[in-house]
């Protein structure tokens, strides 16, 4: 009975960690090819937003200009204008199919994210006692660590997340969130978030760390400041 109680939280934690990848893989394997074929067969003209529509139109214009210049450089081939327009049409269809596939994958990612949130929320409500066991395990693990290891772990995590060398990681994370929700990446918005959000998070974490260390053990505050300096 004790082994079963110990195994259940581990299974629950593994389920939460691997659930998003499993759902995305299943959706992509079962529905990805079918949705792609249906979308391309129906020649859908749906765009997710105005920015993406503008981006596709600009790329199609660039493609037409590139093919036009390429035909000018190949004057000796004497390509017929009708063949030139046919080539543009084929390239445009191929380009739109590639764009449609990226949109479909984006929709699948967004759908799996929403499904994962719903399932995890349901498990949080349904298996609340399992979360209590996980919480007690984590607290026991933290209490068994020495003061120096606790402070070192806190400094390592804060430096990795909000240190001076972490802006590139924030850019990648915010960019991936943009892609998951179907937004076109805007460098100005991303740079603004990277320059402001970590600062706010750093202030909140420092305040929380000070209160936590001061409540657990005042000696931890001294060790924290000594290592941090």
From Swiss-Prot:
The chain crosses the membrane at residues 7-27, 106-126, 189-209. Keywords: Hydrogen ion transport, Ion transport, Membrane, Plastid, Transmembrane, Transmembrane helix, Transport. It catalyses: K(+)(in) + H(+)(out) = K(+)(out) + H(+)(in). GO terms for biological process: proton transmembrane transport. Belongs to the CemA family. The gene is cemA. InterPro entries: CemA. It is a multi-pass membrane protein. HAMAP family: CemA_PxcA (MF_01308). GO terms for cellular component: plastid membrane. May be involved in proton extrusion. It comes from Cuscuta exaltata (Tall dodder). PANTHER family: CHLOROPLAST ENVELOPE MEMBRANE PROTEIN, CHLOROPLAST ENVELOPE MEMBRANE PROTEIN-RELATED. This is Potassium/proton antiporter CemA.
């Amino acid at each position: 009975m004790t082994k079963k109680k110990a195994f259940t939280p581990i299974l629950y934690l593994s389920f939460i960690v691997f659930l998003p990848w499993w759902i995305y893989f299943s959706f992509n394997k079962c529905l990805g090819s079918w949705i792609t074929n249906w979308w391309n067969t129906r020649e859908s003209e749906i765009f997710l937003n105005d920015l993406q529509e503008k981006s596709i139109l600009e790329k199609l214009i660039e493609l037409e200009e590139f093919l036009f210049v390429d035909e000018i450089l190949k004057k000796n081939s004497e390509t017929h204008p009708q063949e030139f327009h046919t080539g543009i049409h084929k390239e445009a269809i191929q380009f739109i199919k590639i764009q449609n596939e990226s949109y479909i994958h984006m929709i699948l990612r967004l759908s799996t994210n929403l499904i994962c949130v719903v399932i995890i929320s349901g498990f949080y409500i349904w298996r609340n006692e399992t979360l209590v066991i996980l919480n007690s395990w984590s607290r026991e693990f933290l209490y068994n660590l020495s003061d120096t290891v606790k402070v070192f772990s806190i400094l390592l995590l804060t430096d990795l997340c909000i240190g001076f060398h972490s802006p590139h990681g924030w850019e990648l994370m915010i960019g991936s969130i943009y892609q998951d929700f179907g937004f076109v990446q805007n460098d100005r918005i991303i740079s603004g978030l990277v320059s402001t959000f970590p600062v706010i998070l750093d202030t909140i974490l420092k305040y929380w760390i000070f209160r936590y260390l001061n409540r657990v053990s005042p000696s931890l505050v001294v060790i924290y400041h000594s290592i941090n300096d």
